[in-house]
A protein has these predicted regions:
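Fungal secretory targeting signals
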Residues: 1-20, 324
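N-terminal, motif-rich segments that launch catalysis or mediate targeting to/interaction with membranes
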Residues: 16-121, 130-239, 243, 248-257, ...
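Glycine-rich, acidic and aromatic/proline-enriched surface loops and short helix-turn segments
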Residues: 126
Length: 324
């Protein structure tokens, strides 16, 4: 499913000219080369690929990679515990770790490297969306709400798609690129300038599980403070537009800015370390081995209630179950 949010995130990482990115140029050029996509719709192609792939027979295995079901108790308590919340089928955190390793593995084919890169581009966006880091009501998919006059809606879809679309004014790639430029300006010289360095302060490609857990925890905390600070019932008493929308849209923009900035930084770290370069195969194998050892899957626990509910959605995030 194409969403402007995903393309904005990719746009943040791909647009040139923002000094806040430093050495971004070589990473994005290398990434685009690996993806073998020079079309004008490059951003949309990359942003939507993982969602499209999970809906295919070949890609069904990847459905759990788009979320981690934090078994917490919002709005009173929000927290992510990798060992508790990531199942043996995987989750966004384990997938980010795995595909970081694969992008870095010089032994893989160009096609396999491109696939890993496309997963990373998408999943670093998913992990910044608070409801992709929450188990309650299948990440908000089963929280029925009204948004902008549409009564047959759900909270997850609003955060994934309809709140961003309302802000952007549409769902075209041009809209997404325009929004990305605005957010880049905020990072480069505006309200995010003093914050941006903290978003990547602990990013470490050699310990991707810890990095991704920190990102998921950061977003999950917002479930308690922003997404549903007064509980589920408070969201179902009237239209979420405009009052709720006006309260949460600054956070939506902040999270998208974080995702794009982290993605750019993550790709830079991979490529500037020369991990993925084919002519450094020996060095790559050493680094890949170290990264793989640091990223085991959590133990196979018995499925809890939230995970069983997720299985009823076919194992996916449920994002495409409700469409206007």
């Amino acid at each position: 499913m194409y969403t402007p949010t995903a393309s904005v995130l990719v746009g943040l990482a791909a647009l040139k000219g923002a000094s806040a990115w430093g050495t971004l140029g070589h990473a994005t050029v290398a990434a685009k080369s690996v993806l073998s996509d020079t079309s004008t719709s490059y951003l949309a192609n990359v942003a939507s690929w993982a969602d499209t792939y999970r809906s295919t027979a070949a890609g069904k295995f990847s459905a759990p990679y788009h979320f981690i079901d934090a078994n917490d108790s919002p709005p009173s308590s929000c927290n992510v515990n990798y060992a508790r919340d990531c199942t043996s089928s995987g989750c966004s955190i384990s997938a980010i770790s795995n595909y970081t390793q694969r992008v870095a593995d010089a032994r893989l084919s160009t096609a396999s490297t491109a696939e890993a890169l496309k997963f990373l581009v998408h999943l670093l966006g998913d992990v910044t969306q608070p409801l992709h880091d929450e188990a309650l009501e299948v990440g908000g998919n089963d929280i029925k709400v009204t948004f902008d006059g549409y009564a047959n809606d759900n909270l997850h879809s609003d955060w994934d798609t309809y709140i961003p679309e309302k802000k952007v004014g549409g769902d075209s790639l041009t809209d997404a690129q325009s929004w990305a430029k605005t957010l880049i300006a905020s990072i480069d010289s505006g309200s995010y300038k003093s914050l941006a360095s903290s978003w990547v302060a602990k990013s470490n490609i050699n310990d991707a599980v810890t990095s991704a857990t920190a990102w998921a925890s950061d977003a999950n905390a917002l479930v308690c403070t922003v997404v549903m600070p007064n509980g589920v019932a408070a969201l179902q008493t009237g239209d979420l537009y405009p009052t709720y929308y006006n309260k949460v849209i600054p956070t939506v923009e902040l999270q998208i800015a974080k995702g794009g900035y982290r993605l750019a930084d993550w790709l830079n770290k991979i490529y500037s370390a020369n991990i993925a370069k084919r002519d450094l195969e020996g060095q790559s194998e050493e680094l890949v081995s170290r990264m793989a050892m640091a990223a085991p899957l959590p133990p196979a626990n018995r499925p809890n209630k939230a995970q069983l509910a997720r299985e009823a959605y076919g194992g996916g995030c449920g994002c495409d179950k409700h469409k206007k």
